[in-house]
Amino acid sequence: MGVALRDILTDLKRPAETDELKGVAAIDAFNALYQFLSIIRQPDGTPLMDDSGRITSHLSGIFFRTANFLTQGIRPVFIFDGKSPEMKGRTIQERRDVREESKEKWDQAKKEGDLAGAFRYAMSSTAIDAYILSSARQLIQLMGLPVVDAPSEGEAQGAYMVLKGDADYVVSQDYDTLLFGTPVLVRNLTISGKRRLHGRQITVQPERIVLSDVLSTLDITREQLIEIAILTGTDFNPGIRGIGAKTGLKKIKSGEFDSIIREKLPDFDPEPVRSFFLNPPVTDSYTLDPGRIDRDGIRAFLCGEHGFSQDRVDPVLDKISKKEKQKTLESWF
């Protein structure tokens, strides 16, 4: 997912302070769901499921993680992708192929008793289908949280909402959110905490990247950042072998973009990709007014339909309700 800009952004990421996270968070819903589905699994990689065999890992992630957001003063808005641009067809097919191959390797690792390998391949086999999307949306709305339907890429819509002043930052793992122009990108918010990586426990912290700091430190424009991404590869075009982010930065600053494209990718027109990042389809058709949490509806959905323990769900609902009452009292002063 996203673009390979990490090597030139490593020194520009910093831990996000608690106060910096308060406010409206425009969450890339597909990205968050993918993280929940990838990580919330049993030791052999099997996702959480209800008695009917329906996956519930994403519901667990949405409910418990979002409840934590609300108690910290974070107001989540979930943005769902719309129609993918035709340019993304290659990437979508490649991801489908990776999932199918990973599924086969996951099954084999389980047969061999290789739990570490099974978990790793299971993560790579993660897929988001119609059930995942509809059940996620239902729970989000039962929690009284706004849902925005993007006409195309969710990160682009989130960036637009931050630029417009309707949100404070975009939450996504994908660096291409910066290419869409978001002033602030927060990574790791949906997966922060202790996580298992390559067989060992690590602590993942939310990190904050400010676009203006990136551009000023690297001494480039947003258009040049997009050109670096095009050279290294995006969801909409393959990269050039041998050119990573650091090399791409050098090439762009020396004015070599056009000549490299002509030499290495003579049949590729970068303009549609550049234009999509600069002027993506977005919409003003949304409302961010929060609704009230439907406690009975959540119990019926999580505990009744999907087998969640009411002993785990009720304390979380109480915590959210307490925060809601506190906010109501504060609004009088």
Swiss-Prot record:
Cofactor(s) required, per the database record: Mg(2+)
Gene Ontology BP, a term: DNA repair
The record's free-text note on cofactor binding: Binds 2 magnesium ions per subunit. They probably participate in the reaction catalyzed by the enzyme. May bind an additional third magnesium ion after substrate binding.
Location of region: I-domain: 117-255
UniProt keyword Repressor present: no
Binding site residues for Mg(2+) 2: D174, D176, D235
GO MF entries: 5'-3' exonuclease activity; 5'-flap endonuclease activity; DNA binding; magnesium ion binding
Region spans: N-domain: 1-99
E.C. number: 3.1.-.-
InterPro entries: 5-3_exonuclease_C_sf, Flap_endonuc, Flap_endonuc_arc, HhH2, PIN-like_dom_sf, XPG-I_dom, XPG/Rad2, XPG_CS
Family according to the record: Belongs to the XPG/RAD2 endonuclease family. FEN1 subfamily.
Function: Structure-specific nuclease with 5'-flap endonuclease and 5'-3' exonuclease activities involved in DNA replication and repair. During DNA replication, cleaves the 5'-overhanging flap structure that is generated by displacement synthesis when DNA polymerase encounters the 5'-end of a downstream Okazaki fragment. Binds the unpaired 3'-DNA end and kinks the DNA to facilitate 5' cleavage specificity. Cleaves one nucleotide into the double-stranded DNA from the junction in flap DNA, leaving a nick for ligation. Also involved in the base excision repair (BER) pathway.
Summary of subunit composition and partner proteins: Interacts with PCNA. PCNA stimulates the nuclease activity without altering cleavage specificity.
Official protein name in the record: Flap endonuclease 1
Gene: fen
